[in-house]
Amino acid sequence: MPSLIPKEFINELIFKTNIIDIINTRLPLKKVGKNYNTHCPFHQEKTPSFTVNFEKQFYFCFGCNTHGNIIDFLMNYEQLTFVESIKELAKIHGLTIPCKNINKEKLFNYEKITNLYLLTKNIADLYHRNIFKTEYAYQYILNRGIDKSMIKYFNLGFSPKNWYDLEKKNKKQCYNQKELQEIGILKTTILGYTYDRFKNRIIFPIRNKNGNIVGFGGRTLNNHIPKYINSPETQIFHKGFQLYGLYEMLKTNPKPKQILIVEGYVDVIALVQFKINYTISTLGTIISNEQIKLLFRTSNTIIFCYDGDVSGQKAAWRTLNISLSHIHDGKNVKFIFLPNNEDPDSIIRKEGHDNFKIRIKKSIDFSKFLLQTLFKKTDLNSISEKSHTSTIAISLIRKIPGKITQTYLFQTLSKKIGILDYHVLINNNINNINTKIYTKKPIKKTTIRIVIALLIQNPWLALTLPSLKHLQNYKIIGLSCFLDLVEKCISMPNSNTGQILEKYRNKNIFKHLANLAKWDHMIHNEKIKDFFLDSLTKICDIILEDRQNKLISQERLNGLNKQEKYELWSINKELAKK
């Protein structure tokens, strides 16, 4: 039964724990006066600045300002959650954790999540068994160079073309359709029919850092678009918080000196197969703040691997922008850029383990990449150009929380632009600098803008839609434009963006559509269809809610006729499913 740990027990546990003894089993402490010192485990340093005070049962680092009690230390050093830290201390002292029962609502949520974890595990096992029963799927994996040990290690699976075929093969268990929809296995279309989201795909189970399977990735066996899909957001799966391969890495390499980040599931598996056992993936998306935090709690050095083309450089720049605010002293971000038309899977099979390790060794430090990128098109003989680029560089460097790292970067920048005293840059007060060098100020994201942008950039999406005539009478800003765009895309099959845009030339909407046509919405190609349909579903929900409110108001004022009552009942029933 889930429970709350009493505060009294936590206080007692801290009281009974000698912080010196616990830390000394992990770090060599040396007594200096009343305190104990060692090199800080959370940043690189030559002179020990990590101090532990016996009287205060507290640690503090003068270099990176990290501090806390023994629970904080275990959470940061061992990458444990708060509850896991309490359990670890209780285990050390041989104590049983007393529990306070929580309320019924929290109990229900706990049991619900526990059941979903169990369901995803069972489904993953079902998929895994099925891959060995489906010859063409099994051969596909082997032909990709992935051996049987990796299939088992990553628990790879296969979902057949029809979910019910899978159930027939495994007659022991019949699964509840509603629960399968909750974890994103089954999906219901706008027209109301249900199908297997991952049908005819290789399955990659996604685990959280505790080993629970929280979602799935799926790779098509043919050229079906999209090539890769992920589970949707659910109660247990939040894409921006998960990293593929993290759990598997921590099992064999709990304290990696560095972590290599690649884009694809197969890239992770290939590199691990070639003994690069510190490789994980961001599920095919741009890195999030939460993922960066998790990575830096696990290792001091993160290496991102990208294609060497323009899109790879742009992705690396976006990653750098997100990473800067997490680079404390002792932490580092590096980049590897592969040759064009190569990915980690293909190149390690061509070059082998040793040559790929050389690429890792030659990875570019974030500071070098930052300045190289900014000054790539800057004329260093032009004072105005140097000044403009420097203001952008200064504002970026100031995002870095590590003061020592920040100082070194200011020194490097000052030498590059010919300023002898780097303190001039540090003391220069620069505000409101636009640091985006690849993109202009982003367009404000609204659901209707997203679907219009996706459609204008991918006209084929219109062919995936059912009839939308029932939406024509509703008034939502941008809806009429979207419906007109759908009509034009359907009337021009196999058309491209330029062709569709041309239909709007000399119309008031043309400029807006042109902006959306080049809008970097940062949605990966394999996710576009699902994202588009999900966004359209949100719009339909907004329309239903708006109509519901109008009918309720009308009912209170003048009453409803039989047809309107039935409409309200239907809307209430539909929205109750959400």
UniProtKB/Swiss-Prot annotation:
Domain Toprim: residue ranges: 257-339
UniProt GO BP: DNA replication, synthesis of primer
Pfam families named in the record: DnaB_bind, DnaG_DnaB_bind, DNAG_N, Toprim_2, Zn_ribbon_DnaG
Positions of CHC2-type zinc fingers: 40-64
Cofactor note: Binds 1 zinc ion per monomer. Binds two Mg(2+) per subunit.
InterPro entries: DNA_helicase_N/primase_C (IPR016136), DNA_primase_core_N_sf (IPR037068), DNA_primase_DnaB-bd (IPR019475), DNA_primase_DnaG (IPR006295), DNA_primase_DnaG_DnaB-bd_dom (IPR013173), DNA_primase_Znf_CHC2 (IPR036977), DnaG_bac (IPR030846), DNAG_N (IPR013264)
Known EC number: 2.7.7.101
Record keywords: DNA replication, DNA-binding, DNA-directed RNA polymerase, Magnesium, Metal-binding, Nucleotidyltransferase, Primosome, Transcription, Transferase, Zinc, Zinc-finger
Gene Ontology MF terms in the entry: DNA binding; DNA-directed RNA polymerase activity; zinc ion binding
Claim: Ribonucleoprotein is one of the keywords in the record: no
Family the entry assigns: Belongs to the DnaG primase family.
Domain notes: Contains an N-terminal zinc-binding domain, a central core domain that contains the primase activity, and a C-terminal DnaB-binding domain.
Chain's role: RNA polymerase that catalyzes the synthesis of short RNA molecules used as primers for DNA polymerase during DNA replication.
Assembly description: Monomer. Interacts with DnaB.
Record-given protein name: DNA primase
Organism from which the protein derives: Buchnera aphidicola subsp. Baizongia pistaciae (strain Bp)
Gene from which the chain derives: dnaG
